[in-house]
């Protein structure tokens, strides 16, 4: 690098060919003008130009291009009031000046102010003093004695210009080498003759070599350069092309940490932007769209002034899967409501879902959307797990807009109550939770299986604390674009309220030191045992942490000593680790939360060792003398109502009291207690700490009206709050019934309570997400104050680390270079060619939306039954069973189900044989007659049907077969013949007697019924009717034996009236035994035995088996 490179400076303009290297004498116009005015007013000799001047203008001589364009050109009237005697001498520091630009008079700037920026960003030019050069001869300065003031001024001006030209030429020859050869001697003469404007224009035309500028002077991309005026571009046009090859293309300005620098203020888009749906080749959506409404999208103006960042983010959210990261209180709900309104207009029957982690957040979003978007209340519902599944199923069929928790949504989707194909928009609040297996991720995955055409809008204030966590959110929700704003962003700066953060650090009190000393003596023996076994390396018991002990246990179990140890040693080490991990939580309570929570934990630990409970090492600690002494000290302290067990708690009490007293809380003129509009929220990590804070603050009621605010799950010594109780506490807090809320992590996210003026963080969190969420509870509607109470040491370091981590993550997310977005899975949904335009108008809020209660479905005395589970199938799914071979093969080659079609025979030509081939030959004719036409013997031959009475014994049993088994018809035939042989000889006479008696009576008047063989009675018999007995016939008798025995042997026939018989049979008409007995003509005709088909089909007529009726017997006796 040449010497001239050392004198170069950095600039943020990418057009490096528009600058030349010259002396400060050309750029410091203030020095020349001061010299001219001094020679005109005071008649002094022009100062001699010296090359080794010291105390130069230095960095003050650098004039920013933007500031030079904004300041007006000076005239002679501005010379008045300037102290020309104190003008400093110039130096040889090099500066960059444009070659082609409209000339403006140089202005002397005393000092340039740098805008506030992070330390890793490059802030302005870097100056380096050139190496000393040997002195060169300078032209002697001419001294002129003016005759008059006007003539002397003109002469002095010419002499000064000539001296400047000579000095410039010598300086160019000295530092620029061959470059000065391009300037001939005549140019200096012409420069002295032309006026000042022409001289300066010529100086701008001096050629310039890019190699004279150091490589690191410009490191910015072309897109990061500030906008240039048209006049400047026109002047640079003819000269720009000759240096275009040396321009740094594709570069991006980066910070000292290797991150991409944030764009300059000039390149940040300001004002309202116009975005259009992306041009994608995708299948048409299955949602029914309203073509008339697609031409516009509505931006509500109900809230007053239009905010540019809300307008731009809303457009992006309509056309892309968007992650919106805005500081709390900047209108994320307004953006969500506007996007929901437009998708509600664009679709006819599709459903829109807003999900939030808790019911208080869900109810808060409902009230905001009702007042902003104007979506009808009749089409909106809020569903939680408390509603019955049957009621939720009815709501899913009738409504279009749903506000619910993600757990309820995934349950309804899995059970088939909700149809995933109808969902067109999913709005996710507190989207930083969408990592791992949280319900947000499961919902998006489930919907994607059935629906490829739905929009996702994710809202959060803190996307994540690490690059991996932010990428997990992007992957879990299929995010395609990110819109992030920080409190330093230009377009939101005017809407951010001031937040004054006060960090207070504390040291351990004397009581805490005493407790730590006694507790260390108690735990020291167990810690020493672990150290002797090389299972733990720490010596100080007060440095124990649950996480550190867990990691130490895992490392020891994986080491050679842990793997090779016997079971007794392993059990001992695990028992010691378990006891110390339980007591390590007590150490954290003592250090950061107070003595009272610490004492409660020890009492619970001691109660687990009563009697035979607890292990060896637990009893060892409880029986230790130091532990007993510690408990004796703590018991009277905690029973004292005035005791405050931590310095942070004492400071917290003073801060809260001072805040309310300054706000005029409770100072009424008439002696009544007035309620101010100010509110305070206190955040604590554990419930024990929250309850202790409430106990201390309640001493000052009614000035301080505190209440605890915890989650739903119950813990030891503390009951949880259901969602209904949480809502009531928030409402009372807004109304003023409570003016102080002491909340755990449940109050960190999403609660929109604009009147909170003071946030007190009782403990610090290493997570930047939780820290920013806590701070975001204040400063929403007016300026707020934040007080952080930290203990010196670990807690203070955690806060600093979380703050730095948050700032770095915001820079990474804004740069967009470290994350992979899913633009391919973000559907367009809208038809191609549709480009909605913005329509700003006042939204008419329906009267039904002004109701105060939430749109929850009403409970019913008898809720509807849960509908059967419905299986929603994705598009193009293969239903039915599939062969295993088709699962691994090509699915495209799978055989499709074809309808069986009957093939029609097609005529085929048959070769007609010759007549000689068809007719029998004489020999064949003789063989036919001999074998088949003539029978030997003299007896006549007859062709008869097969006889069933021939060979009865052989026909009644199956004969042996070899290759072919007997068929079903043969088996039935054999069974029929066996039954026929079982019929006795008196069968014919018995049937004749029965039919003769039956024909003597009219069939419609009476029916012959055997007394001993009546059918089984119905269940509904009258009381006192006994069940008739039934005789079991032997196996060898015929099927007609019971009838023969009952009728023939007893000879008792009882006619029964049909009405009485119907009552006994349950109004059932008797069924004839044979089908031939149905007609009246058959009864009156001569008796014929049943034919063969009737006997065979006897069993087939009984289509349904008889049911065995049970008799209900009753006793009327008084006994």
From Swiss-Prot:
Composition bias, kind Basic residues: at what positions? 859-871
**Subcellular location per the Swiss-Prot or TrEMBL entry:** Nucleus
Bias kind Acidic residues: ranges: 208-219
Establish whether keyword Signal is in the entry. Answer: no
| Binding annotation for ATP | 326-333
Which region ranges are annotated with the description Disordered?
A: 112-153, 176-246, 823-905, 1002-1042
Indicate the segments forming the Helicase C-terminal domain, all copies. Answer: 651-825
EC number of this enzyme: 3.6.4.12
Q: Quick one: where is this thing mainly located? A: nucleus
Q: Which UniProt keywords apply?
A: ATP-binding, DNA damage, DNA repair, DNA-binding, Helicase, Hydrolase, Nucleotide-binding, Nucleus
Q: Which reaction does it catalyse?
A: ATP + H2O = ADP + phosphate + H(+)
**Residue ranges of the Helicase ATP-binding domain?**
313-481
Q: Which InterPro entries match?
A: FANCM/Mph1-like_ID, FANCM_DEXDc, Helicase/UvrB_N, Helicase_ATP-bd, Helicase_C-like, P-loop_NTPase
Q: Which domain of life is it from?
A: Eukaryota
Q: Where is this motif: DEAH box?
A: 429-432
Annotated Gene Ontology cellular components are: nucleus
List compositional bias (Polar residues) regions by residue number.
186-200, 222-246
User: Key word ATP-binding present in the record?
Assistant: yes
One Pfam family per UniProt: Helicase_C
Output one GO BP term: double-strand break repair via synthesis-dependent strand annealing
MF-aspect GO terms: 3'-5' DNA helicase activity; ATP binding; ATP hydrolysis activity; four-way junction DNA binding; four-way junction helicase activity
Q: Which family does it belong to?
A: Belongs to the DEAD box helicase family. DEAH subfamily. FANCM sub-subfamily.
Its assembly, as annotated, is: Interacts with the MHF histone-fold complex to form the FANCM-MHF complex.
**Biological role:** ATP-dependent DNA helicase involved in DNA damage repair by homologous recombination and in genome maintenance. Capable of unwinding D-loops. Plays a role in limiting crossover recombinants during mitotic DNA double-strand break (DSB) repair. Component of a FANCM-MHF complex which promotes gene conversion at blocked replication forks, probably by reversal of the stalled fork.
What is this protein called in UniProt? Answer: ATP-dependent DNA helicase mph1
UniProt source species: Aspergillus clavatus (strain ATCC 1007 / CBS 513.65 / DSM 816 / NCTC 3887 / NRRL 1 / QM 1276 / 107)
Instruction: Tell me the name of the encoding gene.
Output: mph1
